[in-house]
């Protein structure tokens, strides 16, 4: 706890008081190159904190960093049908069958492992539903 106390009570105030912040608008034009370089780190920190707060609290910003989400699960399989329904008779299943739940498979309705790449890209944990006889 003592290092944090020293940082907050001594180091940070000393650093901030040593920054070359002018008293007037005209003073900004009189800053040297070295003074401008000294102002870069706190400016980057303030901008980063502001941007992080913007992303966290502004709903419009949350979709701008990642792909726009349409809310759809199925972006590929039988789009011409109003509802995708597959009926599979349990007697037709030999020992077990894996069915897709991620809508990424090329072998619909069976799972071909496409969810693995989807999980790596998005951090998701979707997998197939496995039916055993």
Swiss-Prot record:
An individual GO BP term: mitochondrial transport
Main location: endoplasmic reticulum
Residues in compartment: Cytoplasmic: 59-133
CC cofactor: [2Fe-2S] cluster
Location(s), subcellular: Endoplasmic reticulum membrane
Lumenal side: 1-35
Binding site for [2Fe-2S] cluster: 100, 102, 111, 115
Entries under Pfam families matching the protein: MitoNEET_N, zf-CDGSH
GO cellular component: endoplasmic reticulum membrane; mitochondrial outer membrane
Membrane-spanning ranges: 36-58
Assigned protein family: Belongs to the CISD protein family. CISD2 subfamily.
Protein name: CDGSH iron-sulfur domain-containing protein 2 homolog
Organism whose genome encodes this protein: Drosophila erecta
């Amino acid at each position: 706890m003592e290092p944090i106390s020293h940082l907050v009570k001594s180091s940070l105030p000393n650093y901030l008081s040593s920054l070359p912040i002018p008293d007037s608008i005209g003073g900004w034009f009189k800053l040297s190159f070295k003074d401008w370089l000294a102002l870069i780190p706190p400016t980057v920190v303030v901008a980063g904190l502001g941007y992080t707060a913007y992303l966290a609290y502004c709903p419009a910003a949350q979709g701008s960093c990642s792909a726009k989400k349409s809310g759809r699960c199925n972006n590929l399989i039988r789009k011409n049908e109003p509802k995708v329904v597959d009926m599979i008779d349990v007697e037709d299943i030999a020992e077990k069958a894996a069915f897709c739940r991620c809508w990424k498979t090329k072998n619909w309705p069976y799972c071909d492992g496409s969810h693995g790449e989807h999980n790596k890209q998005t951090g998701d944990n979707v997998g197939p539903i496995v039916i055993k006889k």
